[in-house]
């Protein structure tokens, strides 16, 4: 590898942002999907947090996960050097987590950040019908009217 020492050339670029509302879900949509079980809800948090065995880093949140969701910690999609695994390896991780890729997917995590790693992996393996719940556990875990599951399922 060569390290360049020259100053970078900075150029103006134009980019037009196209909103993609179908790629984001809110708490009402996720609650509906959890009730109907017509989507795969995939949680990127560590297994202990998903199972409700580890305390939540945000005060006042219940421990556990969205009922019916599957756990695939985002770190399982990464190599030791923090690059993403190969497409076949990532597809295998979704399969090992019990994710039914024939259903539309909703990714979630603690606050909507690491769920994006799951969404990127889904996109890379060719799955187009996925969305991200950006409220994630920070939102779900604070509402006493929403059910919470613990354990592996």
Feature map (PLM): residue ranges:
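Rhodanese-like catalytic fold shared by cysteine-dependent sulfurtransferases
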Residues: 1-40, 44-153
């Amino acid at each position: 590898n060569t390290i360049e020492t020259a100053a970078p050339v900075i150029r103006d670029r134009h980019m037009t942002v196209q909103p993609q509302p179908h790629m984001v879900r809110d708490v009402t949509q996720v609650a509906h999907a959890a009730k109907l079980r017509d989507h795969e809800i995939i949680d990127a948090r560590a297994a202990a947090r998903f199972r409700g065995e580890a305390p939540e880093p945000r005060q006042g949140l219940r421990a556990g996960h969205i009922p019916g969701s599957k756990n695939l910690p985002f770190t399982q999609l990464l190599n030791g050097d923090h690059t993403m695994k190969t497409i076949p390896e990532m597809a295998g991780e979704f399969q090992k987590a019990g994710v039914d890729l024939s259903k539309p997917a909703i990714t979630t995590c603690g606050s909507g950040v690491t769920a994006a790693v799951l969404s990127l992996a889904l996109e890379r393996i060719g799955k187009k019908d996925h969305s991200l719940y950006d409220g994630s556990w920070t939102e779900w875990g604070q509402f006493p009217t929403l059910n919470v599951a613990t354990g592996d399922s």
